[in-house]
């Protein structure tokens, strides 16, 4: 791609990106308006539909239980059995990759926790404020274990015993949260289980101003598909999403990571299969917080009987391969924005290439080669058109000198020359137009994919999702853009010619702030373009010499 058209290409691309980010991308979230909530301790009675979830005030605290597996380190508070802290051990922190990334926390002015509980008409069942008892305060998944179980027991009330059981698994970000309800009384137990994610509306720490990825709650169902609801809409009492469903999931989504309560897993198991009703609920909560959860109306537990409900919680990176094995539609939380239809197959191909070379940087290089090969016929036609334009440059200059300031006659003579020489001045534009969606799709694929987060390439590139720390790739890209100017026809306008010399430097500075993976793509693309353009020019010169000699 010649420098002149590359500039047009980038301007158009970033024009589209600007329009998206300015008018369609999620904006910074305001604090919520005061929400109408039920007073603590007076939950709505269970009916034929799930009861309303209890109000959320300041988190109470008791004893902390630490659970460590090969992938996560969780802290469960015995007040309610909340997951108050969740560290992802194989994902580095933003400010220090050697430390684990903290997905859930209630420290440092942030709140992001997973809560659950049981509601009943007489408020006798344990909620997220009930004090539980545990056997130990620390659990570790041993090398010979594949699962780790943490059991919390609530004090029996009115002859009803309840246990809350967490099951952690090796090589998994799924945590199963089960309630065992054992009715020792002589009366039936009518209950609604609630599971929710509670967090503030702040952007994730370290969020880039270049990112503008979605942060907030989302719901997926087989009928409504993937539905995002912004914090701003929740604060205004708005929000369009499917509420009643016996499948899908409810989640809190942010850049690279997601937490989701799952009603129906990929193996077909559904939490709602034996329930009377299931209902998703997104709402603002007290204390400038937001709640994304699900209410499950349980069947009546008769006297002397027991009932169990098990809800999986996925809390981890938006890793495509992992999420695809957990629940239908969970991969949609990897937010490619409005170019999903292009970014998804591009990442699929990139992932396949990574499977061959086991390095995301080299996978990007191979992807660039394949994309270039796919566009080769269009590019070749473009370069042939540019080569002919370059050959006509001296005649163009003579026409300009001949007609001086009479631009109308100059344009007429120029078009006549193009017609005589069978040259299409717009012949090089089609490859640019075709590649614009590919460029934007790749931009979002690299931006949204956690697989490239903190992924190294070679030497000084330790994170393809961040800018080149030494600006070497942007400098090399500027050099290739300058080299391309010598292969292209010089502009007839002297001012435009000067601009073509300045623009490579200007755009290389702009690329200083782009992910190294994206700059790598364009650097390799430029090198391949130079090689292709040089080859086409040589072939045209050879054909011209042959025609002249004959």
Curated annotation (Swiss-Prot):
Cited Gene3D superfamilies: 2.70.98.90
Domain of life: Bacteria
Record CDD domains: 5TM_YidC_Alb3, EcYidC-like_peri
Keyword field: Cell inner membrane, Cell membrane, Chaperone, Membrane, Protein transport, Transmembrane, Transmembrane helix, Transport
Protein biosynthesis recorded as keyword: no
Topology of this chain in the membrane: Multi-pass membrane protein
UniProt keyword annotation of DNA-binding present: no
GO biological process terms held by the UniProt record: protein insertion into membrane; protein transport
Transmembrane segments: 6-26, 360-380, 430-450, 472-492, 504-524
Compartment list: Cell inner membrane
Gene Ontology cellular component terms for the protein in this record: plasma membrane
Region (Disordered): 30-59
GO terms for MF: membrane insertase activity
InterPro entries, sorted: Membr_insert_YidC (IPR019998), Membr_insert_YidC_N (IPR028053), YidC/ALB3/OXA1/COX18 (IPR001708), YidC/Oxa/ALB_C (IPR028055), YidC_ALB_C (IPR047196), YidC_periplasmic_sf (IPR038221)
Function: Required for the insertion and/or proper folding and/or complex formation of integral membrane proteins into the membrane. Involved in integration of membrane proteins that insert both dependently and independently of the Sec translocase complex, as well as at least some lipoproteins. Aids folding of multispanning membrane proteins.
Family statement drawn from the similarity comment of this UniProt entry: Belongs to the OXA1/ALB3/YidC family. Type 1 subfamily.
HAMAP family reported in the protein's UniProt record: YidC_type1
Subunit structure comment from the entry: Interacts with the Sec translocase complex via SecD. Specifically interacts with transmembrane segments of nascent integral membrane proteins during membrane integration.
Protein name: Membrane protein insertase YidC
């Amino acid at each position: 791609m010649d420098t002149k058209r590359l500039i047009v290409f980038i301007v158009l691309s970033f024009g589209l990106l600007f329009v998206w980010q300015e008018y369609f991308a999620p904006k910074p979230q305001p604090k919520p308006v005061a929400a109408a909530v039920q007073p603590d301790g007076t939950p709505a009675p269970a009916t034929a539909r799930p009861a309303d979830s209890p109000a959320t005030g300041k988190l109470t605290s008791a004893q902390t239980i630490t659970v460590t597996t090969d992938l996560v380190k969780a802290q469960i508070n015995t007040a309610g059995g909340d997951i108050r802290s969740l560290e992802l051990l194989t994902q580095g922190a933003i400010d220090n990759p050697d430390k684990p990334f903290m997905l859930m926390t209630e420290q440092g002015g942030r709140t992001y926790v997973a809560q659950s509980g049981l509601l009943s008409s007489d408020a006798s069942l344990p909620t997220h404020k009930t004090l539980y008892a545990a056997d130990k305060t620390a659990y570790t998944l041993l090398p010979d274990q594949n699962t780790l179980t943490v059991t919390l027991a609530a004090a029996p009330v009115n002859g009803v015993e309840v246990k809350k059981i967490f099951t952690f698994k090796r090589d998994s970000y799924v945590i199963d949260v089960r309630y065992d309800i054992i009715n020792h009384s002589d009366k039936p137990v009518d209950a609604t289980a609630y599971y929710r994610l509670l967090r503030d509306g702040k952007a994730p720490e370290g969020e880039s101003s270049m990112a503008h990825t979605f942060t907030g709650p989302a719901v997926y169902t087989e009928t409504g598909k993937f539905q995002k609801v912004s914090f701003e809409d929740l604060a205004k009492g708005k929000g369009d999403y499917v509420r009643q469903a016996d499948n899908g999931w409810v989640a809190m989504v942010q850049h690279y990571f997601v937490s989701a309560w799952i009603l129906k897993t990929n193996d077909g198991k559904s939490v709602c299969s034996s329930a009377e009703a299931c209902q998703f609920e997104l709402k603002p909560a007290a204390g400038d917080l937001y709640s994304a959860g699900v209410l499950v109306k349980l069947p009546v537990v008769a006297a002397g009987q027991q009932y169990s409900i098990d809800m999986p919680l996925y809390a981890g990176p938006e890793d495509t391969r992992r999420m695809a094995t957990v629940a239908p539609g969970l991969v949609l939380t990897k937010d490619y924005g409005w170019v999903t239809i292009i970014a998804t197959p591009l990442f699929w191909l990139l992932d396949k290439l990574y499977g061959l070379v086991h390095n995301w940087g080299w996978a990007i290089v191979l992807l660039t080669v394949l994309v270039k090969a796919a566009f080769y016929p269009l590019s070749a036609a473009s370069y042939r058109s540019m080569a002919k334009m370059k050959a006509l440059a001296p005649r163009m200059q003579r026409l300009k000198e001949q007609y001086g300031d009479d631009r109308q006659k100059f344009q007429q003579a120029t078009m006549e020359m193009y017609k005589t020489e069978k040259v299409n001045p717009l012949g090089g534009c089609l490859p640019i137009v075709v590649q614009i969606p590919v460029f934007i799709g790749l931009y979002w694929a690299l931006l949204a994919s956690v697989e490239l987060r903190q992924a190294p390439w070679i030497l000084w590139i330790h994170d393809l999702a961040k800018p080149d720390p030494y600006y070497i790739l942007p400098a090399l890209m500027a050099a290739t853009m300058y080299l391309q100017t010598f292969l292209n026809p010089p502009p007839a306008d002297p001012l435009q010619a000067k601009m073509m010399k300045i623009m490579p430097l200007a755009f290389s500075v702009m690329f200083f702030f782009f992910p190294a993976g994206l700059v790598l793509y364009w650097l390799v693309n430029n090198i391949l373009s130079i090689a292709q353009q040089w080859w086409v020019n040589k072939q045209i010169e050879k054909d011209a010499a042959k025609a002249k000699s004959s």
